[in-house]
Amino acid sequence: MVFADARVNDLEALMPGMIDFIVSRGVNNYNGDPYPKLYIVNEQKVCTGAYGKPMDICDIAGYYNDDTNEIFIRDKPTKNMTEDRFQEVVLVHELVHFLQYHDGTWQKVTCKQELESHAYEVQDAYVDLYGIDPQQKIDPLFGLLSSMCPRANPMLFHQHLHGGD
């Protein structure tokens, strides 16, 4: 657990610069809200927290809990990511969601999936800026599909059969 604590401290030290980087992209604002508490946890805890029900496996690298102002990041990369600054890349993505929640963007979107689009753009720009392994960038097709609103695209999300969001 000592490694995780040291890693959390290292990542927390990066938060102010990451917030500045995100804000400099011209979409989000930082209003001085307390930074989120950061946790590095195993895959099961990330999956269960992200889906709100017990799950052992998923392909989610981390998530921001707006109720508790906490970010949870996996201790190991997902199958589509590499070790190269993995947790740092996930943190910058989740900090976009932190800002979206606190600057009101969260309430302005048609569906929560739309929030992913800007987080992916920031993540990719961060990877490029710091020369991080390009595999840490979002696959363009995945990015497109995961940021679409299910209700607006029923044929893609089988809502014509199942209904609801």
Mark where each language-model region is.
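Acidic/histidine-rich, surface-exposed loop or edge segments in extracytoplasmic proteins
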Residues: 1-6, 69-75, 103
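Short pre-active-site segment immediately N-terminal to the catalytic Zn-binding motif
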Residues: 73-91
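Active-site recognition of the HExxH zinc-binding catalytic motif
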Residues: 89-102
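Post-HExxH zinc-binding segment in Zn-dependent metallohydrolases
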Residues: 110-145
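Short, low-complexity, Pro/Ser/Thr/Gly-rich segments in the mature regions of secreted, periplasmic
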Residues: 143-165
